[in-house]
Curated annotation (Swiss-Prot):
Organism whose genome encodes this protein: Psychrobacter sp. (strain PRwf-1)
Entry's Gene Ontology molecular function annotations: rRNA binding; structural constituent of ribosome
InterPro entries per record: NA-bd_OB-fold, Ribosomal_uS17, Ribosomal_uS17_bact/chlr, Ribosomal_uS17_CS
Family: Belongs to the universal ribosomal protein uS17 family.
Protein name per its UniProtKB record: Small ribosomal subunit protein uS17
Keyword presence, Glycoprotein: no
GO CC aspect terms: cytosolic small ribosomal subunit
Gene Ontology BP term (one): translation
Function, as annotated: One of the primary rRNA binding proteins, it binds specifically to the 5'-end of 16S ribosomal RNA.
Subunit comment: Part of the 30S ribosomal subunit.
Keyword terms: Ribonucleoprotein, Ribosomal protein, RNA-binding, rRNA-binding
NCBIfam families found in the cross-reference section: PRK05610.1 (NF004123), uS17_bact (TIGR03635)
Record Pfam families: Ribosomal_S17
Length: 95
């Protein structure tokens, strides 16, 4: 882990913390994170994969494509960003 990333204290219930994979880091101080989840189909009961792309704030530009990161919901930072990077769970391998 990097010491550059702020440690965020999480308190209370209902705090939105999710883990996902970085699919883009081409913006300055911003990353796009792909969140995948499984939901049950209401009629047929089959497990279906659903995904969401979320833009998050990366203050120190530490993330690379392919990293697995943890992000937390926060106040709106811009028109499309209301999530902040908490830490990098797993770094991507160099190919």
């Amino acid at each position: 882990m990097s010491d550059d990333i702020q440690q965020t204290e999480v308190s209370g219930t209902g705090v939105g913390i999710v883990t996902g994979k970085v699919v883009s880091n081409k913006m300055d101080k911003s990353i796009t994170v792909l969140i995948e989840r499984k939901v049950r189909h209401p009629l047929y009961g089959k497990q279906i994969r659903r995904s969401t792309k979320i833009k998050a704030h990366d203050e120190n530009n530490v993330c690379k494509e392919g990293d697995v990161v943890r992000i937390i919901e926060t106040r709106p930072i811009s028109k499309t960003k209301s999530w902040k990077l908490v830490d990098v769970v797993e770094t991507a391998e160099k190919i």
